[in-house]
């Protein structure tokens, strides 16, 4: 029986906001059922709000205190690419350093995590996160109090933000290929949709039940292939 560890952020915890804007974890992806279905052990160490820096620290701690898994999923990038709106609104962040984690630092963190796992004898599977429903996300920011004037100084277009989120995924792909890691991308299932917004919660970042069902399908294909079912 193979053992899988998951390291990531709120996406892998099935997090969704309720009507009062309280965020709750869920088993919307269905990892519990997949353990029995595909005869494997799955431990979820994903933590909401974590950037790659926090994931790396957490992974280091977990790997030093738990049995080494056969495979560890590494899912991050969404929080890294997100703008540091708190610092921006306080005038403490210039345009060049708008991301919570700069691309070059993100790349280094991701390389470090892969190397740590490989040194321990675990295979790393890079998990490319879902895209962001940018227009919904920007509307959410405006409703949360970010001024349109401040936003316009940092966001030139929806396409700009789409390209930046894709860039972090491209970094993961490049690092993964350089280090011989398998890649599981969740992006394509969403990008193929006619109306992607219908699969997201109202913040534009977290999928809704329908969106998490798409993610569940991608994982079912992955585990079925790993188990030799397909």
Protein language model features and the residues they cover:
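Short secondary-structure transition/capping motifs
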Residues: 44-51, 99-102
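Structural motif
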Residues: 49-59
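A short linear-motif detector with a strong N-terminal bias
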Residues: 22-24, 51-53, 161-163, 185
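Alpha-helical cap/lid subdomain in secreted, periplasmic
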Residues: 60-209, 213-230
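Residue-level detector of flexible, active-site-proximal loop/helix-junction positions
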Residues: 11, 49-51, 190
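Short, electropositive, low-hydrophobicity segments enriched in small/polar residues
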Residues: 12-14, 18, 53, 81, ...
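Secondary-structure boundary/capping motif
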Residues: 1-3, 31-37, 56, 115, ...
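Serine-esterase "nucleophile elbow" of acetyl-processing enzymes
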Residues: 1-47, 60-68, 72
């Amino acid at each position: 029986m193979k053992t899988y560890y998951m390291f990531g952020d709120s996406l892998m915890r099935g997090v969704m906001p309720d009507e009062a804007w309280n965020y709750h974890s869920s088993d919307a992806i269905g990892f519990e059922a997949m353990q029995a279905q595909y005869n494997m052990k799955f431990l979820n160490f994903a933590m909401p709000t974590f950037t790659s820096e926090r994931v790396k620290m957490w992974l280091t701690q977990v790997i030093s205190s738990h049995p080494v898994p056969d495979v560890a999923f590494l899912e991050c990038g969404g929080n890294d690419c997100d703008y540091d709106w708190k610092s921006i609104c306080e005038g403490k962040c210039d345009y060049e350093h708008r991301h919570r984690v700069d691309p070059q630092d993100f790349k280094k963190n991701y390389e470090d995590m892969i190397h740590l796992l490989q040194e321990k004898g675990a295979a790393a599977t890079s998990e490319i996160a879902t895209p962001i429903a940018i227009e919904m996300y920007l509307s959410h920011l405006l409703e949360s109090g970010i001024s349109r004037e401040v936003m316009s100084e940092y966001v030139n277009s929806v396409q700009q933000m789409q390209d930046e989120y894709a860039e972090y995924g491209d970094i993961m792909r490049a690092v993964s290929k350089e280090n011989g890691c398998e890649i599981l991308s969740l992006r394509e299932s969403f990008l193929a949709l006619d109306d992607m917004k219908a699969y997201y919660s109202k913040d534009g970042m977290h999928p809704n039940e329908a969106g998490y069902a798409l993610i569940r399908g991608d994982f079912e294909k992955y585990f079925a292939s790993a188990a030799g079912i397909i």
